[in-house]
Amino acid sequence: PGINYKNNGMTYHQLKYLLWSVVVGVTLSLTSCMKWDYGDAVEDFNATGAGLFITNEGNFQYGNATLSYYDPATKQVQNEIFFRANGMKLGDVAQSMTIHDNKGWVVVNNSHVIFAIDLNTFKEVGRIENLTSPRYIHFLSDEKAYVTQLWDNRIFIINPKKYEITGYIQVPDMTMESGSTEQMVQYGKYVYCNCWSYQNRIIKIDTETDRVVDELKVGIQPTSLVMDCNNKMWTITDGGYEGSPYGYEAPSLYR
């Protein structure tokens, strides 16, 4: 959203679709060449206590994402812990990490994978593959979770116990090329999700039916979503960029 393009006679939507096709084709090609095999040289870790995991996104298409661990008791940081514990690189663009069921779930966006790791040894205990471009994971139970996507008009439903994709939630009025679902919060049986890139809404999902049942219009491109201790939702919009056919406005904060 922060890039301006010269169209050289092409319409904006034609150019955008062309760029989207190239990006998807290249990333899928790169991913197909990426090896997930374990290496021989691995280290043994035994982290205890209340540590802090740090996802280091890396450079897009460079495959240099890493994971770090900070121990407040010793005030020491261990870098490259995933590589050092497993003997393989984490992948391309570490987007987010969520802790659930005594595992760390690391979402690697441009490698189309989520790794589950042991919180003490940092070793992989499972993975979910064949995702489009995963962003965030939200757990409904030990056997059900939602995964938001970029470049897809669906939210994936997964079974964390089996590390399997079990279904999809179709987002209304969203195409594949403009697809963008981002962060999620839950209140009761409903999950709320902000739709970010070229979108201006927060959708409401019934977790019993796995369907979008309502939506709330906000400013252009809500980038994040949180819920406070009073069960009030907050979102920040980036407003798009000048010259965007979707529009541009000042960033805003909504409650």
Predicted regions and their residues:
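Predominantly soluble domains enriched in secretory-pathway, periplasmic, or organellar proteins
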Residues: 33-255
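Bacterial Sec-dependent N-terminal signal peptides
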Residues: 1, 5-6, 11-13, 17, ...
